[in-house]
Amino acid sequence: MRNIYHTLLLTGVVLVSPLIVSADSDQTAGDWFKNSYGPLWADTPYQDIEAILTHYHSEIVTHGSDGSLSTTPSREWLTAPMDSWREEGWIRAELTDMTATSINAATTGVMTVWTDYYAGDVTETSCGWYLVDAINNEWKITHYADTPCS
């Protein structure tokens, strides 16, 4: 009887396991962030807005330092700050450090350090936290918070 139970359990696992798939099973959320999302900011982010937007869910939840949460359509969330940064002379950003922490098979937190490049050879460091979720079998950024660079 015990062997039958174990055989049935093993058979069930073998049959069901292909149905349990996280986003893009070929790469982790951290690899996706580092190799797909990060490079889009390195050269011509203004020309790559549509490609950058494919990495976001339709809305982004921003976690404010005052404890507030706000939900914004991703296009507005991305383009409004980019326009403001451009007016300040911002040119591009380079992902210089990153730590990804898997929360579960479908959710990963990503802490980042970026080097921002401005006109006149000025650089600045900025840091942020992103929540990346598997949505419809694709990794998407769903949440963001500025973080102190330490």
Can you name each region flagged by the protein language model?
Residues 1-8:
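Bacterial N-terminal signal peptides that target proteins for export
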Residues 12, 17-54:
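Short, low-complexity N-terminal intrinsically disordered segments enriched in polar/charged residues
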Residues 39-42, 63-68:
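Second-shell loop/turn segments in exported
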Residues 46-63, 72:
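Short, well-ordered alpha-helical segments enriched in acidic and aromatic residues
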Residues 56, 66, 104, 112-116, ...:
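A mature extracytoplasmic/lumenal domain signature
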Residues 61, 76-120:
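Surface-exposed, charged secondary-structure patches
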Residues 125-150:
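Short beta-strand edge/turn micro-motifs at domain boundaries
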